[in-house]
Regions:
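Extreme N-terminal starter segment of soluble prokaryotic enzymes
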Residues: 3-7, 21, 287-291
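Short acidic capping loops at alpha-helix termini that bridge into adjacent secondary structure
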Residues: 186-189
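Flexible, gly/pro- and Lys/Arg-enriched active-site loops
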Residues: 332-340, 351-450
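N-terminal beta1-alpha1 ligand-phosphate binding loop
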Residues: 285-318, 324-330
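Catalytic domains of carbohydrate-active enzymes, especially glycoside hydrolases
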Residues: 47-63, 258-259
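Active-site-adjacent loop and "lid" segments of alpha/beta metabolic enzymes
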Residues: 2-3, 10, 17, 34-43, ...
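Short, charge-patterned binding micro-sites
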Residues: 66-71, 151, 322-348
Length: 450
């Protein structure tokens, strides 16, 4: 039995699978089964993507053709017109983007626009889709759909043997993964999805969910996509589809315990909160290294930073590992104010980055931070700079911090904690400007946090 996949290679990006990752659903279609027409315009689509990213989505799955039961096929030109502007905008901001398509022309256009992943509901049965995946070296999701479903054909054997059906799905996914590998797709780029609701009944979907552990141990990243599906409504008694989000979170948590490392959902916030609590209570949240920047220029600066360091150490599932020296620095971005005290603290934490950011804001608030003048005087700043295995590009949840590379008051203290700060930044995709072009230059060493 293979070990659970630890990462998913998606072109130029690698998604760490130390915790369960959330794929937010972004349908730019007028006829999706639960949110059709809600995100038709580019502005509406991007606003919803931003909300999902800040709620905890690790990647966004953009779809331009509904494949709900009884769907109407969409021409490739129309599908491209729907998805490409959204993908271009998200990818330009550093968002990890998947495109939900079964058409090679759309796949190429989406990848050229910056998508990192092809999510094919037809399981890469089209040889041209396989060629596209191999040519671009992107991440792929090979999904199972019942034979004839995408052509609108009814099944003759539905419901006869649910356990046998689950075994068939597992065998199909393994076969399609091998097809992709033989075409030159990197095995670590292949994710498998059993496809609940694609021609299946509730008993079959439940049997497939019960077999999650066995399927995850095939060694490929496993995507669980139960969001608002009919089987979720059938067992929870929740209807219509939009009323199934809490029930979806229950399925997601069961799948995560069984080894699913990517979940595809509409309601990111509910599932993210449920997964955070599941991982904390089950003791399966991984400990991660993180760097936190501390700063301030009001009152007793050194005492304020020491108190913030103690508050970090008191956070749940978190401990301070090391701290830089405290530096006195010139103001950055806004002059004519007192000099700052700045430091960087290394922590080990099992908190999700969104939960950590909320905790950091709480430390600022407890210190009396008032946010009036941007970049103006403040008693305390507590910023998440970097977190191991985490990359986020939401308006509120952004990691690594986008301004690390231009801030002398961050890079110098960070250099106290890493062997080579410029090499560290290069590994993490952080561009550093030349020392003379940085802001907030160091004036002197002020003291220590110990």
């Amino acid at each position: 039995m293979a070990e659970l996949a630890q990462e998913w290679r998606c072109g130029s990006r690698v998604l760490d699978l130390g915790r369960t990752r959330i794929m937010g659903v972004l349908n730019v279609t007028p006829d999706s089964f639960s949110d059709g027409g809600a995100h038709d315009s580019l502005a509406e689509a991007l606003a919803w993507a931003d909300k999902m990213l800040d709620d905890g989505a690790d990647l966004i799955d953009v779809g331009g053709e509904s494949t709900r039961p009884g769907f109407t096929p969409v021409g490739q030109d129309e599908e491209i017109a729907r998805v490409v502007p959204v993908i271009e905008a998200l990818a330009a901001r550093g968002v990890l983007v998947s495109v939900d398509t079964r058409h090679p022309g759309v796949a190429r256009a989406a990848l050229d626009a910056g998508a990192h992943i092809l999510n094919d509901v037809s399981g890469f049965e089209d040889p041209e889709m396989v060629r596209v995946a191999a040519e671009y070296g992107c991440g792929v999701v090979a999904m199972h759909a019942c034979k004839g479903y995408l052509a609108g054909q009814a099944r003759a054997d539905a419901g006869k043997d649910s356990a046998g059906f689950a075994r068939e799905v597992k065998a199909y996914l393994l076969h399609q993964a091998h097809v992709l590998e033989q075409a030159g797709v990197d095995p670590s780029s292949i994710c498998i999805d059993p496809g609940p609701g694609f021609g299946t009944n509730a008993d079959e979907d439940l049997a497939v969910q019960a077999a999650t552990s066995a399927t995850t141990h095939l060694g490929y990243p496993y995507l669980c996509a139960p969001s608002r599906k009919r089987f979720v409504g059938a067992v929870s008694g929740s209807n219509p589809a939009v009323a199934r989000d809490a029930a979806t979170a229950g399925v997601v948590c069961a799948a995560a315990l069984a080894g699913a490392r990517i979940v595809r959902v509409h309601d990111v916030r509910t599932c993210a909160q449920a997964l955070r609590c599941l991982e904390a209570c089950a003791g399966i949240a991984p400990a991660r290294r993180a760097f936190i920047a501390l700063g301030g220029n009001m009152g007793d600066r050194l005492a304020s930073l020491k108190a913030a360091c103690s508050a970090l150490d008191a956070l749940p599932q978190t401990g301070v590992v090391a701290a830089s020296r405290v530096y006195e620095t010139e103001p950055a971005y806004l002059g004519d104010q007192d000099l700052f005290a700045n430091a960087v603290v290394e922590i080990s934490t099992r908190l999700h980055p969104r939960a950590l950011i909320e905790a950091l804001l709480g430390i600022e608030d407890a210190a009396g931070r008032v946010r009036t003048v941007k970049n103006g005087p403040r008693c305390l700043d507590v910023d998440l700079l970097w977190m191991e295995g985490e990359r986020h590009a939401g308006p509120r949840l952004t990691c690594p911090h986008p301004l690390i590379g231009e801030r002398d008051f961050v890079l110098v203290p960070l250099g106290d904690l890493v062997d080579d700060v410029e090499a560290f930044c290069a590994r993490e995709g952080i561009a550093c400007v030349a020392p003379g072009q940085r802001v907030g230059h160091i004036e002197r060493v002020l003291g220590n946090l110990a």
